[in-house]
Amino acid sequence: MKFLKNVLEEGSKLEEFNELELSPEDKELLEYLQQTKAKITVVGCGGAGNNTITRLKMEGIEGAKTVAINTDAQQLIRTKADKKILIGKKLTRGLGAGGNPKIGEEAAKESAEEIKAAIQDSDMVFITCGLGGGTGTGSAPVVAEISKKIGALTVAVVTLPFVMEGKVRMKNAMEGLERLKQHTDTLVVIPNEKLFEIVPNMPLKLAFKVADEVLINAVKGLVELITKDGLINVDFADVKAVMNNGGLAMIGIGESDSEKRAKEAVSMALNSPLLDVDIDGATGALIHVMGPEDLTLEEAREVVATVSSRLDPNATIIWGATIDENLENTVRVLLVITGVQSRIEFTDTGLKRKKLELTGIPKI
């Protein structure tokens, strides 16, 4: 016990030393690190994307610039962001895209130079929107194409509509998804319909609120995995190794405040209806373990070991652990499983698992 007490006291002294007694060389190194830190921009397209940007801005997102783009001037006025861009001023006159993705696309092309200027110095660009409407569905692929052309690692985090929103909206979403696939390194898809499997019989208003929460947590969790100092830090090169050409990706989110909180949180994430794929064939995984001040390294390792045991031995796994003071006694796990496109097919009613055809097996 005395040994442990001494270790804790020495650790406390070391923290004080790190904060108070930096040499000129150390300060120079810190300044250099700040200058060379990966520049990350989050772009919210359309109504759902703007809502996400506003929430991220209000809650605080560490180490990222926020940009909101829209064809609707009124929505943009209500949005909080570091940079706002009203796209397609000549085309829509600030009145919106009327649910037409083609108008959203043309509006983004009209404002391409302004979009490019807003993300020009970015090493990584996150694009977020709710697919199915006009502005987000139409503009997000244009933003992604611009991002790729400037050499940024380009990741989109998007939602698919609820089935109750109608076939036209779902058809728009699937077409937008196909265009996004062409211009993104990794495309993270959140099928809203699957939320009903998590919370059955949700009222309509609550369903949309839950969808927004999932989108916000996914974007924030991904960004802060890179930008936020934590127990285990992940650098940009690590993330790039998983997300560069990561293809289609799915997420799983779980949390628990029980005695076995880490075990239960990762189990929930792996069994999340949102992660509706066979992950054994995935090419990579990003794992973000979040928890309060008493989050232990052993808990983080337990999460990673559990996920690793389910993946192909050749899959690239990157993980990090950060402290979130808002998570009182709760461990939250965010999984992003990449390279799952071979298991998924796109239909006008959403994403479906492909039926695997078994060959060489005699019929009985």
UniProtKB/Swiss-Prot annotation:
Primary location group: cytoplasm
One CC-aspect GO term: cytoplasm
Keyword annotations of the record: Cell cycle, Cell division, Cytoplasm, GTP-binding, Nucleotide-binding, Septation
GO BP annotations, alphabetical order: cell division; FtsZ-dependent cytokinesis; protein polymerization
CDD domains (alphabetical): FtsZ_type1
Transmembrane spans: none
Keyword Cell cycle: yes
Alphabetized PROSITE patterns for the sequence: FTSZ_1, FTSZ_2
UniProt xrefs under InterPro entries: Cell_div_FtsZ, Cell_div_FtsZ_CS, FtsZ/CetZ, FtsZ_C, Tub_FtsZ_C, Tubulin/FtsZ-like_C, Tubulin/FtsZ_2-layer-sand-dom, Tubulin/FtsZ_GTPase_sf
GO MF annotation terms: GTP binding; GTPase activity
Places the protein is found: Cytoplasm
Residue positions binding GTP: 47-48, 97-99, 134-136, 165, 169, 212
Domain of life: Archaea
Pfam families (UniProt xref): FtsZ_C, Tubulin
Function: Essential cell division protein that forms a contractile ring structure (Z ring) at the future cell division site. The regulation of the ring assembly controls the timing and the location of cell division. One of the functions of the FtsZ ring is to recruit other cell division proteins to the septum to produce a new cell wall between the dividing cells. Binds GTP and shows GTPase activity.
Complex formation: Homodimer. Polymerizes to form a dynamic ring structure in a strictly GTP-dependent manner. Interacts directly with several other division proteins.
Annotated family: Belongs to the FtsZ family.
Protein name as annotated: Cell division protein FtsZ 1
Record lineage: Archaea, Methanobacteriati, Methanobacteriota, Methanomada group, Methanococci
